[in-house]
Amino acid sequence: MKTISLVYISLSGNTESFVTRLKDYLLSQYKRIEVQKIHIKDLVKEGKNFYEMDHPYVAFLPTYLEGGNGVDNGDVEILTTPVGDFIAYGNNASKCFGVVGSGNRNFNNQYCLTAKQYSQRFGFPVLADFEMRGMLEDIKHVAAIIADLYELEKEN
């Protein structure tokens, strides 16, 4: 049995929706897996300490910024910084396969900017991106990436 860990934060419900649908899709398509959702907001809200991951994971990060346009006059990450703190804890950054960014394309250059910044900060790739709650095609695309990373076997 392989454990797939999805580390994320959801503030408006969009990322929660995507990660939940992704979990359901993975469980329906691949055998001998369990999918663990780790919602950083819940850890913070419940006052739980961050911990070191003992196996690889994929991070999911929405974009919440204030100030600037994200390109030539700056930006400030807001609300999602606990994810960065979790990734920075112990050796967690080295266990992260990469980040999946989300956002709203209406914000142009700021779309998925936080995921791109985490990629640079921690040295792992941006694996994919999706807008708002994501579509079924986004779920399938991210699931295929996860299947490759974890070397999963199809359910057929």
From Swiss-Prot:
InterPro entries: Flavoprotein-like_sf, RNR_NrdI. SUPFAM superfamilies: Flavoproteins (SSF52218). This is Putative NrdI-like protein. GO terms for molecular function: FMN binding. The lineage of its organism: Bacteria, Bacillati, Bacillota, Bacilli, Lactobacillales. GO terms for biological process: protein modification process. It comes from the Bacteria. NCBIfam families: PRK02551.1.
